[in-house]
């Protein structure tokens, strides 16, 4: 399957299939220098393939730690200095091979190395079907997640579904949150279909027909970002579940998608309060439990600390916390939410998880 962005210019292909990695050579063969930036776990599981790609293209290979630990100023400085030491030219292409954090980090390296070199996304997780598309790159700050970054498009996204074969279930859960989010942004039929396809842990772990749902997720995101690349309007819809989710992720250091799923539940409660919707919160909580999302962390939540982190969310403005809420499934809108409402929603939320 192949998609393509539809900006006015500077578009890029998105290839989603088994053996998609076979297309990589055609994109990088003419560069003077190529650097593979590889997640350490991916390198461990796929070292023979990656060594072949490195040698075939006379490339450099840089192995980086897995996950968010890479997305710090100190690691960024260390890495970009090591790249500069290789005396690379602007005719360089960086290739991000890993999950969302690897793509975010490598994209930010590319955006800033020599004032900008090309890069290609090779996502290896379900989660990265979301982050690899759309051109957001960046690292974290002590003040919050993804607060240092840029909008910087890749030259291609090459999504080889073979990489999903080695994903542990906790990573499947993390990625599924973004797939489910895209269904919520579509319509009730999309939500019913995905819940029917993956009603429990066994079904989700099988990843049966995941290609279809990944394709639909990417398609949903593309339809939004071509209208609003720089997140001034409708692109904010893609942050469904992320205002509260990012705060939870940052404070408790849990996987991104686990936190986003928690944020989606919280969003439903806020919607019920201020939009007069009637979402069945128990249904969504039970669905998360049926998939075996680890929800024990919720018993450690404290409102004021999470509220402080929500205040630092980069989507906010002078009027305060902005959240993406669902007026109905498939009908997102951005609303300012005051502290009293957030606190009320938090009390309702935590009541559902009391021992």
From Swiss-Prot:
EC? 4.2.3.4
Annotated positions binding Zn(2+): 178, 242, 256
The UniProt keywords, alphabetically, are: Amino-acid biosynthesis, Aromatic amino acid biosynthesis, Cobalt, Cytoplasm, Lyase, Metal-binding, NAD, Nucleotide-binding, Zinc
Locate the residues binding NAD(+): 66-71, 100-104, 124-125, 136, 145, 163-166
Annotated localization: Cytoplasm
Q: Which Pfam families match?
A: DHQ_synthase, DHQS_C
Indicate yes or no for the key word Flavoprotein: no
SUPFAM superfamilies, per database record: Dehydroquinate synthase-like (SSF56796)
Concerning InterPro entries, the annotation shows: Dehydroquinate_synthase, DHQ_synth_AroB, DHQ_synth_fam, DHQS/DOIS_N, DHQS_C
What processes in GO biological process is this protein linked to?
A: amino acid biosynthetic process; aromatic amino acid family biosynthetic process; chorismate biosynthetic process
Cofactor binding mode and count: Binds 1 divalent metal cation per subunit. Can use either Co(2+) or Zn(2+).
Under the heading CDD domains, the entry gives: DHQS
Q: Which cofactor does it need?
A: Co(2+); Zn(2+); NAD(+)
Which reaction equation describes what this protein catalyses?
A: 7-phospho-2-dehydro-3-deoxy-D-arabino-heptonate = 3-dehydroquinate + phosphate
* Pathway given in the UniProt record: Metabolic intermediate biosynthesis; chorismate biosynthesis; chorismate from D-erythrose 4-phosphate and phosphoenolpyruvate: step 2/7
Q: Would the keyword Transmembrane helix be found if you checked this record's keyword annotation?
A: no
Q: Which GO terms describe its cellular component?
A: cytoplasm
Q: Name one GO molecular function term.
A: nucleotide binding
Principal place of residence: cytoplasm
Q: Which HAMAP family match?
A: DHQ_synthase
Q: Give the family this protein belongs to, as stated in its UniProt record.
A: Belongs to the sugar phosphate cyclases superfamily. Dehydroquinate synthase family.
Q: What does this protein do?
A: Catalyzes the conversion of 3-deoxy-D-arabino-heptulosonate 7-phosphate (DAHP) to dehydroquinate (DHQ).
Give the protein's recorded name: 3-dehydroquinate synthase
The species this protein was found in? Staphylococcus saprophyticus subsp. saprophyticus (strain ATCC 15305 / DSM 20229 / NCIMB 8711 / NCTC 7292 / S-41)
